[in-house]
């Protein structure tokens, strides 16, 4: 699934600041930084609801950084979002993490910012990555806890559901695997 970067409000702001760093890095590294900043997006974001395992939290941040997502959100009602630094490998320095103390607060903040709420679940018939319409406006992909998936509160508040079609015996995928398969690319 390809997606054009249509909502990077920060390109000029970041561009001016990265230009001031040019004299301190090689031209090649400066080009990587310039290209990376130009591709950052806030058109899509991720909400991780009560992610228990530090390795999954770190892998989620790495996925967000790799796919150009500038900001992700976390709900921390059951546990703190605490990425394992050995797995994050510094990518947490490039992604803004917004922490919320409740699911209701997170969903309200995302709606206030103009996002539609897209819950990931294997149990609902709605859209697949191939049929998901990224052009309908900014969206937040919601991933649930490793233990129970998304909460009833997310199910009740979602605008649509995104599922990965599966035909094996397993009922669900690891949150990070699901992230990898559902995030559109710029």
Explain the meaning of each model-derived region.
Residues 4, 8-14, 18-125, 131:
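RNA substrate-binding interface of SAM-dependent RNA methyltransferases
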Residues 55-56, 127, 149, 173:
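Residues that form or flank phosphate/diphosphate-binding pockets in enzymes
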Residues 60, 154, 179:
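Aromatic/hydrophobic pocket-lining residues that form π-stacking "cages" and hydrophobic walls in ligand
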Residues 117, 142, 178:
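A residue-level signal for conserved active-site and pocket-lining positions in enzyme catalytic cores
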Residues 123-166:
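Active-site/ligand-binding-proximal alpha/beta "capping" segment
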Residues 167-177:
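Short glycine/threonine-rich catalytic loop with a Thr-x-Gly-x-Asp
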Residues 179-185:
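Conserved small/polar residues in nucleotide/adenosyl-binding loops
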């Amino acid at each position: 699934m390809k997606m054009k970067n249509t909502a990077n409000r920060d390109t000029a702001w970041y561009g001016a600041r990265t230009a001031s760093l040019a004299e301190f890095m090689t031209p090649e590294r400066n080009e990587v930084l310039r290209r990376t900043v130009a591709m950052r997006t806030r058109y899509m974001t991720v909400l991780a609801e009560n992610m228990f395992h530090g390795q999954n939290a770190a892998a989620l941040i790495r996925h967000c950084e790799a796919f150009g997502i500038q900001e992700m959100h976390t709900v921390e009602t059951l546990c703190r979002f605490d990425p394992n630094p050995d797995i994050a490998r510094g990518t947490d320095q490039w992604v803004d993490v917004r922490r919320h103390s409740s699911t209701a607060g997170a969903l309200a903040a995302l709606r206030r910012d103009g996002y539609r709420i897209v819950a990931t679940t294997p149990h609902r018939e709605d859209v697949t990555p191939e049929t998901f319409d990224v052009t309908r406006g900014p969206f937040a992909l919601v991933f649930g806890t490793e233990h129970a998936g998304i909460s009833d509160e997310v199910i009740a508040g979602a605008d649509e559901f995104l599922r990965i079609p599966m035909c094996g015996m397993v009922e669900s995928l690891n949150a990070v695997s699901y992230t990898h398969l559902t995030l559109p690319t710029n």
